[in-house]
Amino acid sequence: NPLMPNFQWLPVGYHGRASSIDVSGQSFKRPLGQTMAPGADAPSFGPSKRMDYELEIGIWISRGNELGEPIALDDADDHVFGLCLLNDWSARDIQAWEYQPLGPFLAKNFATTISPWMVTLEALEPFRAPWTRPADHPQPLDYLESADNRQRGSFDIRIESWLQSAKMRDANQ
């Protein structure tokens, strides 16, 4: 499906619950939901058969702001305590059925796992890189723009993940 016109203009987020966040290595129940098999006349209900995860970077917020008061981009780093690795788990078969037109809901709110380690922004400072936006993309609106952020840059962090099954672990692979 083509991206909606607002994709390049608005930050994208998903619904989740703080109660579904746990430390990596914890087990969780496979989510239940509706799925629609190819060629089926009606959806069925049951456990997800297509589990997946997205490796992401989690941000730990150190202090808040007054309700309804935005935080200026130039002040945002002062509110961040550190970063961690985060696995955003998804039930892709449930998501395929429920995501249009409003986006995933039950397919993405059942589990999020985070690393037990956190890295401070101070430790990441040597990894800042110039921030640029592709010429064919619209420039951000003023409230999403900061000359200081452009000058300081963003963090150039590259992450990879590998999946290792119990069978692979037993075989030392």
Regions found by a protein language model. Name each.
Residues N1-N172:
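Active-site microenvironments in enzyme catalytic cores
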